[in-house]
Amino acid sequence: MPTDITIYHNPACGTSRNTLAMIRHAGIEPEIIEYVKNPPSRAVLADLIKQAGLTPRQVLREKEPIAAELGLAGADDDAILDAMMAHPILIQRPLVVSTLGVKLCRPSEEVFDLLPPDRRRPFTKEDGEVVAPRD
């Protein structure tokens, strides 16, 4: 089974770091896109959100101060995507893409669903919590 995985990663985020470590723990070296420095195009982001079965609002980091400054509380999807393009920190992370689908991996153990079944192993997160794949 192919193991191509891409993670839209922010190294400042513990959930993103744990997700990346879980992928590597499965013996897979993913393509890492530090999306704050190298954001995806608007079309790619919109497609990732759609493939994940989410809306732009569900991928918006609403607690970021810039979200309030921009008045995104009542914004439509297009305005949210525009804001994410201008301020990539507004994109919730990590988004992970594999041959098994696309997910916003919050919590990080959501990534188990995107790993080949024979590579899903229990993992100890940064805070010491042990997580395991669902049966």
Residue positions per predicted region:
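A short alpha-helix capping/helix-coil boundary motif
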Residues: M1, R24-A26, R42, V59-L60
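Thiol/selenol-based redox catalytic cores and closely related redox-interacting motifs
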Residues: Y35-D135
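Residue-level preference for short coil/turn positions at secondary-structure junctions
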Residues: M1-T3, I91-Q92
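Local sequence-structure signature of Cys/Sec-based thiol-disulfide redox active-site neighborhoods
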Residues: P2-A26, P30-Y35
